[in-house]
């Protein structure tokens, strides 16, 4: 009888303590540019991913793309920290053999083409401390415009002809 009373008292104390602790937490609000992940293969049933990118998704909110990602300037390719591209196997990128591992993704927007940069400096806030000597690889890609506007910056992967293409979209590009 005493054991049961002791156990009931203990359980009640734990429940009250946990309830009080949870209600006392001060959780941060959702970030204005929430994190997202794009992976290949994109099918959620496929657990053997070949690559993934973690990035933040800024939104236009009435602003222009050229104001948020100015032409000719290094851009963090999203918001907050520079995106982190993780390769789970070796890949060729513009003729360069990239070893499996993680790389920062930066870009230089342009009117007709963008330069995509894979960089060794991880965990970098924005592109403020960018050093060209830490570039691993660069490639220039043409700008393709569309009539539809995309409010939030987005990244997706697609396989074509046994290659994996990364698509980045924001506003009308």
Predicted features, each with a name:
Residues 17, 65, 92-94:
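Alpha-helical interaction segments
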């Amino acid at each position: 009888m005493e054991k049961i009373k002791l156990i009931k008292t203990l359980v009640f104390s734990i429940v009250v303590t946990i309830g009080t602790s949870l209600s006392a937490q001060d959780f941060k609000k959702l970030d204005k540019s929430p994190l997202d992940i794009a992976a290949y293969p994109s099918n959620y049933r496929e657990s053997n991913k070949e690559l993934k990118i973690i990035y933040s998704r800024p939104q236009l909110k009435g602003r222009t793309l050229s104001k948020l990602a100015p032409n000719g300037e290094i851009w963090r390719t999203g918001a907050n920290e520079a995106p982190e591209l993780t390769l789970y196997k070796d890949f060729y990128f513009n003729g360069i053999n990239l070893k499996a591992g993680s790389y920062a993704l930066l870009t230089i927007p342009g009117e007709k083409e963008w330069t995509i940069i894979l960089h060794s400096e991880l965990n970098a806030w924005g592109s403020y401390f960018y050093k060209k000597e830490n570039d691993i690889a660069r490639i220039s890609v043409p700008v393709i415009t569309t009539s539809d506007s995309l409010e939030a910056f987005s990244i997706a992967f697609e396989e074509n002809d046994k290659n994996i293409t990364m698509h980045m979209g924001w506003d009308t590009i």
